[in-house]
């Protein structure tokens, strides 16, 4: 069934689903390709706005407001496609297709002990991110749920090399409740890489974590939290390297092998696998596959 015979409602559903599948850094490319197929500017613009809003939340798209980094997520969504930034005290809409802030408005915040703690935690987290990530961004948000105060720390770094046919994203999120003596930190680390020269190869790895932190004062909590994040992300990075190395040595040999016609020619799979190297950015944690011989076989 072609798109031309679908109802408008079905077209909207298909377009949005395809756009939401776009890997980080490739949303605009996916949108432009779909525009060539759909040829309905009004329909594409509306669906692009809706899907772009969700894409920003899913992949923590970074912005810069008044010289400060802002990470978009569902934690700072206000509704009506608007986001809120604690640091600049502004609310705004973001057009991902045009990479443009729109309808910027001031938005006040309550200055209490939790807000002061948020600022202290952000300072400690920035020191860690600046030391470990080449182009990293971080943000700390406040949220109140059923009269309980929470801090949400987000970290993001990416390298989108479309010209080299690969993109990579590392992000993590850490949430803890503001308690007097002890709090539990819930975290999630996520890595995604996409290589698309001759072969379409996706890697997605994530891990959920739970750790406890003692609270003495604001400065101690901020430093302990930053050390916890550093320790857990270092462990995750080491585990990713180990697991992917094992995968490249064993599992990928079976996954990537395909039935070929009988040519009476011996295919040296070991030589192919030896060219399937893992590339690691030590401070960032991106993992991608190098190509060369592999790409000559998978077409």
Swiss-Prot record:
GO biological process: actin filament organization; barbed-end actin filament capping; cytoplasm organization; spermatid development
GO molecular function per UniProt: actin filament binding
Superkingdom: Eukaryota
GO cellular component term of the entry, any: F-actin capping protein complex
Modified residues (Phosphoserine): 290
Keyword Phosphoprotein applies: yes
Keyword field: Actin capping, Actin-binding, Phosphoprotein
Keyword Phosphoprotein part of the UniProt annotation: yes
A matching Pfam family: F-actin_cap_A
Binding partners and assembly: Component of the F-actin capping complex, composed of a heterodimer of an alpha and a beta subunit. Component of the WASH complex, composed of F-actin-capping protein subunit alpha (CAPZA1, CAPZA2 or CAPZA3), F-actin-capping protein subunit beta (CAPZB), WASHC1, WASHC2, WASHC3, WASHC4 and WASHC5.
PANTHER family tied to this protein: F-ACTIN-CAPPING PROTEIN SUBUNIT ALPHA, F-ACTIN-CAPPING PROTEIN SUBUNIT ALPHA-3
Family to which this protein belongs: Belongs to the F-actin-capping protein alpha subunit family.
Functional description taken from the UniProt entry: F-actin-capping proteins bind in a Ca(2+)-independent manner to the fast growing ends of actin filaments (barbed end) thereby blocking the exchange of subunits at these ends. Unlike other capping proteins (such as gelsolin and severin), these proteins do not sever actin filaments. May play a role in the morphogenesis of spermatid.
Protein name, UniProt field: F-actin-capping protein subunit alpha-3
Underlying gene: CAPZA3
């Amino acid at each position: 069934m072609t798109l031309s015979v679908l109802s408008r409602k079905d077209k909207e559903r298909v377009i949005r689903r395809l756009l939401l599948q776009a890997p980080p850094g490739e949303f605009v490319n996916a949108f432009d390709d779909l525009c060539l197929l759909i040829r309905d500017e009004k329909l594409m613009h509306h669906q692009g706005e809706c899907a772009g809003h969700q894409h920003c939340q899913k992949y923590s798209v970074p912005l810069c407001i008044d010289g400060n980094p802002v990470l978009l997520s569902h934690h700072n969504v206000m509704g009506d496609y608007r986001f809120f930034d604690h640091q600049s005290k502004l609310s705004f809409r973001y057009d991902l297709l045009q990479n443009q802030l729109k309808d910027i408005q001031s938005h006040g915040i309550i200055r209490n002990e939790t807000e002061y703690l948020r600022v202290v935690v952000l300072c400690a987290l920035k020191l860690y991110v600046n030391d470990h990530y080449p182009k990293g961004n971080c943000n700390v948000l406040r949220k109140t749920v059923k009269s309980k105060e929470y801090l949400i720390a987000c970290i993001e770094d990416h390298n989108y090399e479309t010209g080299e046919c690969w993109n990579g994203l590392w992000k993590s999120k850490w949430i803890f409740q503001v308690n007097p003596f002890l709090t539990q930190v819930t975290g999630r680390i996520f890595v995604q890489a996409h290589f698309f020269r001759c072969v379409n190869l996706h890697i997605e790895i994530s891990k959920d974590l739970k750790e406890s932190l003692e609270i003495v004062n604001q400065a101690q909590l901020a430093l302990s939290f930053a050390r916890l994040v550093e320790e857990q992300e270092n462990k995750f990075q080491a585990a990713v390297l180990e697991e992917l190395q094992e995968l490249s040595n064993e599992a990928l040999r079976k996954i990537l092998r395909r039935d070929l016609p009988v040519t009476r020619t011996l295919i040296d799979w070991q030589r192919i696998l030896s060219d399937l190297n893992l590339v690691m950015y030590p401070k960032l944690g991106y993992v991608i596959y190098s190509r060369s011989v592999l790409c000559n076989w998978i077409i």
